[in-house]
Amino acid sequence: MQANFQKYNLQFKQASGTSRGVLTTKETYILEISKEEKKGIGECAIFRGLSYDDVPEYEEKLNWLCQNINQDFDILKKDLKHFPSIIFGLEQAFLNLKNGSDLYFPSEFTEGKDFIKINGLIWMGNAEFMQSQIEEKLDQGFDC
């Protein structure tokens, strides 16, 4: 089995306030594992300044994972215990490798017919901006 990753810098459509500052970009890493003719893809996503595993050696740990991808999964998880976003991406990639192009969890959401009702994200801002987002989410059917 082989593994590699690619870093992407996503640009937010608008500056987005959090409890720890304003975000305009987001780094994410796409992990790809391959075995014979099959491949699996997973996302290792961190928010700088917010994520538990936002540490200087993040890419170094991704490189380590790629070099050690043939280790037992439990050994990989143990060595990655302080990098939950990398574990998540690795689990996604293994599921994708196992299931091929099939969706992980077929649903109304993955078919674009519905949304995840608990993920109505509200960005920090002044009271008027936050209130308008709340009203918009309620109008869209978010209720929790």
Report residues per predicted region.
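N-terminal capping/lid subdomain adjacent to the active-site entrance of alpha/beta enzymes
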Residues: 1-144
